Amino acid sequence: HIATFKTTMSAARYVPNVYCYEQIPIPRLYLNSFCPDYYVNITDTIEKKLNSSKAHISQIKKYKSIGLNIIENLEILSKFRGVQAKCKYAEAFKIIKKVW
């Protein structure tokens, strides 16, 4: 992931705004080090997001086999970020580079 990030940042050197998206927490060695500073209200599109995520059947099966429901986790995370953003559901991002 570090190499991908570095490559992306190099490729985006002339792009004015770069944001990192939050991944769904999967308890392996998960340390919550993600500190968002930008939120997008997704209240109107949460159902579409959840339904689209259900297309990732292999990931759903993989984590279901160890007792995790990643669709449920995604909804919970979106609700949590919604509380932070003062709306019902939100996505969180970390601003890496922004031209104001």
Q: Where are the regions that the model predicts?
A:
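Metal-dependent de-N-acetylase/amidase catalytic core
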Residues: 1-100
